């Protein structure tokens, strides 16, 4: 039997600080995390505070499109 859309989807979280600084070339790179989210519980874009190895501090990582 065919299922509908999967409830759990794989998402990519990207550092918002590095993404803004990427235009100015101040940062060495962009920190990204791969995780999963439940589409029914969190239909909106996910934002988590995670450690960025390029900024050397905890920053907000937001969900990006694939």
UniProtKB/Swiss-Prot annotation:
Predominant place of localization: plastid
GO annotation terms (biological process): translation
Alphabetized Pfam families for the sequence: Ribosomal_L33 (PF00471)
UniProt xrefs under InterPro entries: Ribosomal_bL33 (IPR001705), Ribosomal_bL33_CS (IPR018264), Ribosomal_bL33_sf (IPR038584), Ribosomal_zn-bd (IPR011332)
Record keyword rRNA-binding present: no
Single Gene Ontology MF annotation: structural constituent of ribosome
Localization: Plastid, Chloroplast
Gene3D superfamilies from the UniProt entry: Ribosomal protein L33 (2.20.28.120)
Record's keyword terms, sorted: Chloroplast, Plastid, Ribonucleoprotein, Ribosomal protein
GO annotation, cellular component aspect: chloroplast; ribonucleoprotein complex; ribosome
The keyword RNA-binding belongs to this UniProt entry's keyword annotation: no
Family to which this protein belongs: Belongs to the bacterial ribosomal protein bL33 family.
PANTHER family: 50S RIBOSOMAL PROTEIN L33, CHLOROPLASTIC, LARGE RIBOSOMAL SUBUNIT PROTEIN BL33C
Cited NCBIfam families: PRK00504.1 (NF001764), PRK00595.1 (NF001860), rpmG_bact (TIGR01023)
Name listed for the protein in its UniProt record: Large ribosomal subunit protein bL33c
Protein species of origin: Calycanthus floridus var. glaucus (Eastern sweetshrub)
């Amino acid at each position: 039997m065919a299922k509908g859309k999967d409830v759990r989807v794989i998402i990519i979280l990207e550092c918002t600080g590095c993404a803004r600084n990427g235009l100015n070339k101040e940062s060495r790179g962009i920190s990204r995390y791969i995780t999963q989210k439940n589409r029914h519980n969190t239909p909106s874009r996910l934002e988590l505070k995670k450690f960025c190895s390029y900024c050397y501090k905890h920053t907000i990582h937001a969900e990006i499109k694939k």
